[in-house]
Amino acid sequence: MLFDRRKLLLGGAAGLMLPGLARGALAQGGPLSPAQIGTFPEGVTADSVFVGLNMPLTGVFSGDGSDLKLGYELAIAQINAGGAVPAAWGLKGKGVLGRQIRYKVADTEGKPNVAVQAATQFVQRDKAILFQGSVSSAEAIALEELASRDKVLYMVGIAGSNDVTGKNCQRYGFRSQQNAYMAAKALAPVVAKALGKKLKAAFLVPDYTYGQTVYDSFAKFTKEQGWTQVLKETVPLGTADYSSALLNIANSGADVFVNICFGSDAVASTKQAEQFGILSSMKLVVPNLSSFQDKEVGPELMQGVYGSCDFWWTMSDRYPLAKTFVDTFFEKNKYKPRWGAHIGYMQTYLWALSVERAGGFNPVDVIKVMEASKSQPYESTVGRVYFRAEDHQMVRPIPILKGKAPSAMKGPEDFYEVIDVVDGESVMNPPDLFGCKLGSYT
């Protein structure tokens, strides 16, 4: 289902530039980029460009998807309006190179085939110069493949599987979230120090690319810390009744329950784990916290829980751009943004900056700018970041969180303490570890 969010088209001096000029390639030196590729230059008018937004607004991942959507919409509104907020990111004027961003939103339902159908419409009907979004890693992988086939840039939304920037990486896809390897390598030493090094762990693993790669990475790095796996229970995506798996976990003798489920599956499995007495007999670790797991499960169950995520709103105390994001998001939406919203917000700004650096919307030029960002990193809501040229994985800090006790919460949304922000460079996988081969620009 598509939701139209057309914006007023406001021209600017930059709107007079001819969209077919490969200015970025000329500025960077080297061979000229193709004058026509994908939806370029057809998708660039004198005063606007179109961006397609894909995310689940129904189904298992609807909470994360709805948050992601609001982050995209806030960034687009700010960029279109111009002024102090986009200027603080380094953007000039209103819009991107003087062009307003038009957009539509598609509900992917968390299903790869639905996501591809929606994105295909954005490309063929709307001449999208960019499409963004996902919550399921499976849909992210499918959208990456579409992007490289149609030669249209794609910014991955929420997707933690190593495969997204590993064996399924694509030249036209970029990921802003840390991958499973990075998150696990950052989290494992923290939980081992806090909980102990000689512990037994039981894993609950959703049976798709995200669950399996998070399991592989977290099992590897906790084993290096001295943990022993006593049980791995695999469950289908969208499971309603976890009793069989949880009964086995309750009887496993484990010290730690590692719950890899995401979205509403994480909420349901955690609540059911409490009914089986697991949370009173074991420590809970969540390698990748869902956007609203805190609120939906409640602080009584989430207190003392360790996990990682992309962003937590109290990081506004650390980074000026994060403070502006949190404040403006709260003003518009009346709740503190979760990390889904942050992904959408941050990556929209990074795309706009990359277009301005390239001097145009030609996707080949924009990709090359993003691939060169190590030498010219972006200042962002989580500090300095860049995309690695070899696999398009963002190198970025990783927050490690611990759930607060209800009595320690300073407000209704103060669910976590940020106990560490791990340097991204220190936890990166070797670029060839997961078999990434990016493919051709053209």
Identify the meaning behind each predicted range.
Residues 2-12, 24-442:
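Extracytosolic ligand-binding ectodomains
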